[in-house]
């Protein structure tokens, strides 16, 4: 008799995706982040659902409803901090996942890569709207500053901003619609993630060496399920330490002050995971130019497959490209640091240089390095 997991219509999908999936035998821990992102997403949807049961999306009660969750709801504080710090873990896993794709040339699976970019944008939009919901000072001013960037779009900019606001300023209508979008978008992310997996399983996984691995595949279960469980336990450990010992480490103290449209915080800045893009935005003294650079800082990932000039797929055997990759990582860390600093003398210049370097590495240096490496190997 045939096993039920191979015949039942629903079980068959699960079997082909997570049990009998042929997987390269040499994929490293860098391939764990996909499953970790799935865990983060499920955790977020669950904690978010419980938070939504007690949250009110009204400007007069939003802040106090979050306080009520933390003080009066059974284990409300842990649900709230799991949700807030879970976002940080989500973005750490996301950036590691994208970095892995860049390093090992996984972007040559163009459909999977492009769906991934759409996913990245959607998750960023969701996180931004979620940051607005507690209606603290940084929530209000963050929403005001970031939505205002759309006014840089010629001709329709101002009308577009007021249409998003639902009025002439960030107010009740804005908060209500942001809550609605913040609630629905994770389910869109879930659907997109399924499409992402669908396209990935059409081609099969990449591997560290970047060569075809059809001749050496092993079943996903038990080899990689156990490996993913180890990664998940480490993720849960870090998240638990963060939530139970220093839940506000990555947050902004200004968000514990209720939103006040008449009082601007001294330094308006987003959550740490957006600081690199915020630094690129601020480094250009022109509003439209800054907005374009901000969008391009993520959208540049879409043209990475077009700039792949190497005869090899990954960077495992390409030392010059490896150096450039780690220079890019260092540059992004520098941008993250700059994004959190005030706009004054040394930081402005460092930010501008780091922004130029970011685009130069991806658009100019990496393609040139690949050609040089091809020539060294006489390819």
UniProtKB/Swiss-Prot annotation:
Keywords: Electron transport, Heme, Iron, Membrane, Metal-binding, Mitochondrion, Mitochondrion inner membrane, Respiratory chain, Transmembrane, Transmembrane helix, Transport, Ubiquinone
Residues engaged in binding heme b b566: 97, 196
Free-text remark on how the cofactor is bound: Binds 2 heme b groups non-covalently.
Cofactor: heme b
Record PROSITE patterns: CYTB_CTER (PS51003), CYTB_NTER (PS51002)
GO cellular component: mitochondrial inner membrane; respiratory chain complex III
Keyword Cytoplasm included in the entry's annotation: no
Molecular-function annotations in GO: metal ion binding; ubiquinol-cytochrome-c reductase activity
Binding site for heme b b562: 83, 182
InterPro entries registered for this protein in UniProt: Cyt_b/b6_C, Cyt_b/b6_C_sf, Cyt_b/b6_N, Cytb/b6-like_sf, Cytochrome_b, Cytochrome_b_C_euk/bac, Cytochrome_b_N_euk/bac, Di-haem_cyt_TM
Positions of a ubiquinone binding: 201
Pfam families: Cytochrom_B_C, Cytochrome_B
Record field: transmembrane: 33-53, 77-98, 113-133, 178-198, 226-246, 288-308, 320-340, 347-367
GO BP of this protein: mitochondrial electron transport, ubiquinol to cytochrome c
Taxonomy, superkingdom: Eukaryota
Location(s), subcellular: Mitochondrion inner membrane
Lipid bilayer topology: Multi-pass membrane protein
Misc. remarks from the entry: Heme 1 (or BL or b562) is low-potential and absorbs at about 562 nm, and heme 2 (or BH or b566) is high-potential and absorbs at about 566 nm.
Assembly information from the UniProt record: The cytochrome bc1 complex contains 11 subunits: 3 respiratory subunits (MT-CYB, CYC1 and UQCRFS1), 2 core proteins (UQCRC1 and UQCRC2) and 6 low-molecular weight proteins (UQCRH/QCR6, UQCRB/QCR7, UQCRQ/QCR8, UQCR10/QCR9, UQCR11/QCR10 and a cleavage product of UQCRFS1). This cytochrome bc1 complex then forms a dimer.
Family that this chain belongs to: Belongs to the cytochrome b family.
Function: Component of the ubiquinol-cytochrome c reductase complex (complex III or cytochrome b-c1 complex) that is part of the mitochondrial respiratory chain. The b-c1 complex mediates electron transfer from ubiquinol to cytochrome c. Contributes to the generation of a proton gradient across the mitochondrial membrane that is then used for ATP synthesis.
Name of the protein in its database record: Cytochrome b
């Amino acid at each position: 008799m045939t096993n039920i997991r191979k015949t039942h219509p629903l079980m068959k999908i699960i079997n082909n995706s997570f049990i009998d999936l042929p997987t390269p035998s040499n994929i490293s821990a860098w391939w764990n982040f996909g499953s970790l992102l799935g865990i983060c997403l499920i955790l977020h949807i669950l904690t978010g659902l419980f938070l939504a049961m007690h949250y009110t999306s009204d400007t007069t009660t939003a802040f106090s409803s979050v306080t009520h969750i933390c003080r009066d709801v059974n284990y409300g504080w842990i649900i709230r901090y799991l949700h807030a710090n879970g976002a940080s873990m989500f973005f750490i896993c996301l950036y590691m996942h994208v970095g892995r794709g860049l390093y090992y040339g996984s972007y040559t699976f163009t459909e999977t890569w492009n769906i991934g970019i759409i996913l990245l944008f959607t998750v960023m939009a969701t996180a931004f709207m979620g940051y607005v919901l507690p209606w603290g000072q940084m929530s209000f001013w963050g929403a005001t500053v970031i939505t205002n960037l759309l006014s840089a779009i010629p001709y329709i900019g101002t009308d577009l901003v007021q249409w998003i606001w639902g009025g002439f300023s960030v107010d009740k209508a804005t908060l209500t619609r942001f809550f609605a979008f913040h609630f629905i978008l994770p389910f869109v992310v879930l659907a997109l993630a399924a499409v992402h997996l669908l396209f990935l399983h059409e081609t099969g996984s990449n591997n560290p060496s970047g060569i075809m691995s059809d001749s050496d595949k092993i079943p996903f279960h038990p080899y990689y399920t156990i490996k993913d469980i180890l990664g998940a336990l480490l993720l849960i450990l870090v998240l638990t330490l963060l939530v139970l010992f220093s839940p506000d480490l990555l947050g902004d103290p200004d968000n514990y002050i209720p939103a006040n449209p008449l009082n601007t915080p001294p330094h308006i800045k987003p959550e740490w995971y957006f600081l690199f893009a915020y630094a690129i935005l601020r480094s250009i003294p022109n509003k439209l130019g800054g907005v374009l650079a901000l969008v391009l800082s993520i959208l540049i990932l879409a043209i990475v497959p077009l700039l792949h000039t190497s005869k090899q797929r990954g960077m495992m055997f390409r030392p010059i490209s490896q150096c450039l990759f780690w220079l890019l990582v260092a540059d992004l860390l520098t941008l993250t640091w700059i994004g959190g600093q005030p706009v004054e003398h040394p930081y402005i210049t460092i930010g501008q240089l780091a922004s130029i370097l970011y685009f130069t590495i991806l658009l100019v240096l990496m393609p040139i390095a690949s050609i040089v490496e091809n020539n060294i190997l006489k390819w």
